Amino acid sequence: MCGIVGYTGVQGASPILLEGLKKLEYRGYDSAGIALLNEGQISIAKVTGRIANLCEKTNDGKDYPGTTGIGHTRWATHGAPSDTNAHPHVSNDGRFAIVHNGIIENFMALHDELTAKGYHFESETDTEVIVHLIEMYYKGDIKKAVIKTSARLQGSYALGVICADEPDKLFVAREASPLILGVGVGENFFASDVTALVSYTRNAIYLEDGEFAEITPEEIKVFDCTGQTVNKKITRIVWDIQAAEKGGYEHFMLKEIMEQPHAFKATIQPRINDNDIVLDDSDLSKEYLESVNKIVITACGSAYYAGCAAKYTIEKLCKVPVITELASELRYSDPLIDEHTLLIVLSQSGETADTIAAMKECKSRGAKTIAIVNVVGSTIAKLADHALYTWAGPEIAVATTKGYTTQLAVLYLFGLYTARKLSRISEEEYSKLLSSLKALPKKIQETIDMNAKIHKIAIKYYDNKSMFFIGRNTDYAIALEGALKMKEISYIHAESYAAGELKHGTIALIEEHRPVVALCYNEALMEKTMSNIVEVKARGADVLAVTYKGNMKIVSVANDVIYVPKVDTLFSAAVEIVPLQMLAYYVAKLNECDIDKPKNLAKSVTVE
């Protein structure tokens, strides 16, 4: 959830650190800070609020000289947002400064131990115990002090450390939190995400859990907990630098909504060879797939809702039970999972803490794992037996859009691939569905082209305090994501319900002019959903229906209708979700919300 950066080289470090922190804003934060090494002294600047405040305080870094430094964006976990609780934190003797992403689970015991030994704490954070431990263990060898400190920590951490006695060095450590080293010429970097590095280098080293590194302008040395050297491969970063910029759009979210046709196509096209689907280097043989008696999809947030939508598609195509589980619940549920379970894990960042923990639990029980992630080299990608990447490019807005639709794209490919392997559908049906899948980017674009109409509808609904989203089957899964989009960026209370459950309590909340967004795409369930619309209309609700072009029945029961292109119902989520994304965007804009960085939210949830 936090973001960390570090630099050592010949340039002034402050502007590079500030720029790197800006690139990490999408992860979510409430405060920020930098620490610079200069002439044997450590200088610190910390602020509550936006990085713009930090730039102002430091005069864009000019008032904080030095060619080695570290930076941090904080999302509060221990201690309220404040300048004092912001990172970097400094040792009592002023010799060390650190930045930390993660949570130290045993920090209270360490805090009590260090307090008893005379160490003074300035903040309420778990992180401060780390810098005092380093000071305690330091006997002239910072490398040994960091290793000894790490051995005392329980939980997750990506650490960046500077020492006044080592003026041109950075020290880093990783455990269950992402950390990437940027390899330059006469300068080197570290960051919690490649987006902070690509403006300066395309060469990266991905640290693994339990690894440490000593970084100077000339070289990077990676070692393990025994101090032994670890040989690491340099990976080329392929993301386009400009892809992380707004490109003329007012917000990243709008830009990313508009990019969905391209992202969807970029995700499916390389995996379709003539009439065959090629799932990268996965070895999902017919023999193995026949042994699978259950597919479990696990994720958090929007990724989970993508799994819920695709569940119906995969189950119908493959004739195999598909269960969707929230990762934060699955990991604690003593799941009935074994070697006959195929686990599909979804995460845009590939670093979602609860998802990683659930994945490890299921792997320990024998499940084979497929990871659907957007970040190459991420923790989840490396943990999985097979990684299938969503080629969405960097997604900066906290509220996911193209990340969600490209996850659907991979899940659709998986469903078709598996159904064909298991001979659960005919070749004729397979070819027809594959053609429908290949047509989806165009259909998504047609939906985006209705943005002017959706903006007009948003004007009608933006000043409400509460909204409901309803649907059946896949439409209900889409309602879940639609409600999430509305609440997370517009701060309007929005809840989703299975349409058939309204009469079991929820209908008591319907009152005059309460907006109800009804997803009505599934023809087989149309009459049932329309009857639910009539029920809420009778109680005064204003109904906005989302349905396929040509469905004229809906006009008689809805106040407003958004028509999206007609596609196979198995793939309808990819087009139905787009107007809901745009509706949430325009409602948030009309309410003057911080669309790209909603309050209290983080893009990449790397703590539990």
Sequence positions of predicted segments:
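Glycine-rich phosphate-binding loops that contact phosphosugars or nucleotide phosphates
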Residues: E290-K432, S436-A439, L519-I562, L583, ...
